[in-house]
Regions:
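A conserved amphipathic helix/loop scaffold
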Residues: 2-214
Length: 214
């Protein structure tokens, strides 16, 4: 979140303080809505929530890479190293726990991912531009930790599932196929009947199906 809108950090602060799980990525909280840099340290107005201060960022040339190595007994139970490239942020923890460290270069051993307990919640930070596999694993584990319900058990590549819930408890589930061909996907139509679109076990290319239920 490079650019911060006024009031956004206060929403994040209250969300985490009241028990939310928050994930921030590298190079966040740098400028305001007019692209003016914040003074006094970054991520702006979230250093206490995140438990660290950003000190520097290393830009890598094309083809260069570093890696994040999981700390033993880390809270997310990460077991494998992941490569990172392009941008690697160097942070100085205050209260944050180190989840992963960089594997080489002059910042070998410095935090590459952190977790900070703030109020009743937790704030995680990914400090570099990692390969997609890290984000997949971390987001899956954070969703499980937060108790997020999986509406569709298996989501094929190129298919996106989102859900909106009304104040009365009615849920609308949007299933969109961004592939050039139809794909098979098992939808929970017993609980969420088809409200818009046609479904026969597959979703056509570039098609959207909307389910509705509670």
């Amino acid at each position: 979140v490079y650019l911060l809108r006024e009031g956004w950090t206060e929403k994040v602060r209250n969300f985490v303080k009241n028990g939310g799980i928050f994930l921030l990525t590298y190079w966040s909280g740098i400028v305001d809505e007019t692209d003016l840099c914040y003074l006094g340290g970054t991520p702006h107005d979230l250093m206490d929530v995140m438990g660290f201060r950003s000190m520097e960022i290393d830009g890598l040339y094309d083809g260069e890479w570093n890696e994040g190595i999981p700390e033993p007994e880390n809270p997310l139970h990460l077991e494998r190293a992941y490569r990172c490239s392009h941008l690697c942020e160097l942070v100085q923890p205050s209260t944050a726990e180190v989840v992963m460290t960089y594997g080489k270069d002059f910042y070998d051993g410095m935090p590459a991912m952190t977790r900070n307990v703030y109020g009743k919640g937790k704030a995680y930070a990914v400090c570099a531009d990692f390969e997609q596999g890290l984000y997949d694993e971390v987001c899956r584990k954070l969703a499980e930790e937060a108790g997020v319900e999986r509406i569709v058990e298996e989501v094929p590549e190129g298919v996106e599932v989102t859900m909106r819930e009304q104040k009365d408890g009615t849920r609308y589930v949007f299933v969109q196929n961004f592939n050039r061909e139809a794909v098979e996907v098992k939808l929970p139509i017993e609980r969420y009947p088809v409200w818009q679109g046609t479904y026969d076990g597959t979703i056509g290319s570039w098609k959207t199906i909307v389910l509705k239920g509670r």
